[in-house]
Amino acid sequence: MSYTKDNDKLYRYLFQNRAVRGEWVRLNDTFTETLNTHQYPKAVQNLLGEMLVATSLLTAIMKFEGTITVQIQGDGPLKLAVVNGNEKQQLRALARTQAEIADNASLSEMIGNGVLVISIMPNDGERYQGVIALDKPTIRECLEDYFIRSEQLQTHLVIRTGEYEGKAVAGGLLLQIMPDGTGMPEDFEHLMTLAETVKDEELFGLEAEELLFRLYHEEQVEVYPPQETEFYCGCSRERSGNAILLLPMEEIDEMLAEKNGVIDMQCECCGTQYFFDKNAIMEFKQEADKLNQLGL
């Protein structure tokens, strides 16, 4: 098998006679570009892959315009892991470690005592934040518990990370009983059992329609057009310049003196470097002063 047209794609589908909806996503370049600028331990790479898949699936199932942040905070060797996504399936991820992490470390060994925080920020409407105890062995199980508690909807996730043809890849399936109350638990359990039979090479290597046929060839499945996923940082020179202006000018001048007249800032997410001399900083300050005068 070889890479297919469905790399970096998310598909939604509906089981017509079961009142269950589903999603499938595979992250190829979306995942590898997240890892390119960091030397994360293998276990952290896998965790970020799982979180990217989960965020992609969550963003698609909630059907709103805005952003979702899935964040892990703990007191273990992995201090922080965070993924941001939006309705355009633009994703980014970041992790911070504070001690060595073995390649085969479990979630609890990495996190220690920690929580999973899901922040939903619609462009229009109220923000929502859910906090979930990381008291289960995997992210998948914690998220399934989240859906039961917050949405009262049976939800099943399959999330895998690994390598395919020498490249990092992450993929997943989501099944959810329809929120209109017409779904039957036994139908959901049947489809969930079938989903668990998926092999890594199928999830990572098949096109969506072939994968769904292999899993659900006796079902009537309506597949909707795909949505592309991509790594998207969103950093910019303007944002970095404005971040410098959060400091007092006296402190900025001291930094310029210490750094031979040039302040450099590197994006923690994508690794892009931005350089600012005194003239550039003053240009940003003048623009900020104008906006303040206009009340913007």
Curated annotation (Swiss-Prot):
**Which NCBIfam families does the record match to this protein?**
PRK00114.1
Kindly give the CDD domains that the UniProt entry links to this protein: Hsp33
Q: List the disulfide bonds.
A: C233-C235, C267-C270
Q: What is this protein called?
A: 33 kDa chaperonin
Source organism, top-level taxon: Bacteria
Name the protein family: Belongs to the HSP33 family.
Summarizing the function annotation, the protein's role is: Redox regulated molecular chaperone. Protects both thermally unfolding and oxidatively damaged proteins from irreversible aggregation. Plays an important role in the bacterial defense system toward oxidative stress.
